[in-house]
């Protein structure tokens, strides 16, 4: 479900790759169907999860599910590539840490580290001076308290990803303000208690 929230809608097309023990036991344990259900926005207690392949077809979502050896990845890893008309492609790599919890470890090829269990702002931006200050100022203006902030980048002056966990839900006005800033490529907000 974190992947769907990050993408902002259910994808029209998805490629799902299972690695390690997910590849070995995913179908037997229902991991494959649970991943498709999450992309469709189904909650963990949704009775349609065993039928998620059929539901995806009915909703017009094409997908492929394959096993893949992902070098250096955690044994319980899934890699998901999502596409939809008018939405930039998104590639997410995450692994299970047990008990229904996950850790997102790559976003569009950049190493990251977050769970989506807290209110989380994810900003993809050009790696240049002043971006972190702009984000902090916008959050301060909206009276949002930052719990943690991590910054990742592909290379100096390349693309960066800020992962900001907050104590409150971030209002749409603050998200809109951030999206309007030059150098900001994409802004996504994960509300663990919000809609998918």
Could you say what each language-model-derived stretch is?
Residues 1-7:
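Alpha-helical support elements that line or immediately flank enzyme active sites
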Residues 11:
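Conserved active-site segments centered on acidic
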Residues 15-54, 58:
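A structural-propensity feature for long, helix-poor, extended segments
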Residues 20, 84, 166-168:
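Non-catalytic surface loops within mature trypsin-like serine protease
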Residues 27, 47-51, 65-68, 88-196:
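A conserved regulatory-domain signal marking ACT and ACT-like small-molecule sensing domains
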Residues 42-87:
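Contiguous domain-boundary segments centered on the initiation and propagation of an alpha-helix
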């Amino acid at each position: 479900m974190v992947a769907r929230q990050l993408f902002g809608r259910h994808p029209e097309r998805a490629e799902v790759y299972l690695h390690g023990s997910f590849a070995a036991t995913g179908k037997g344990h229902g991991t494959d169907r649970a991943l498709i259900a999450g992309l469709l926005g189904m909650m963990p207690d949704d009775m349609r999860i065993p039928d998620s392949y059929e539901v995806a077809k009915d909703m017009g979502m094409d997908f492929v599910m394959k096993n893949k050896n992902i070098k250096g990845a955690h044994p319980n890893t899934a890699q998901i590539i999502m596409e939809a008309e008018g939405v930039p492609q998104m590639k997410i790599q995450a692994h299970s840490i047990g008990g229904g919890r996950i850790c997102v470890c790559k976003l569009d090829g950049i190493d990251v580290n977050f769970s989506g269990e807290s209110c989380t702002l994810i900003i993809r931006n050009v790696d240049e001076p002043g971006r972190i200050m702009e984000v902090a100022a916008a959050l301060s203006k909206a009276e949002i308290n930052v719990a943690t902030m991590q910054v990742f980048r592909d290379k100096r002056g390349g693309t960066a990803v800020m992962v900001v966990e907050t104590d409150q839900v971030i209002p749409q006005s603050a998200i809109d303000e951030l999206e309007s800033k030059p150098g900001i490529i994409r802004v996504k907000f994960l509300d663990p208690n919000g809609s998918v």
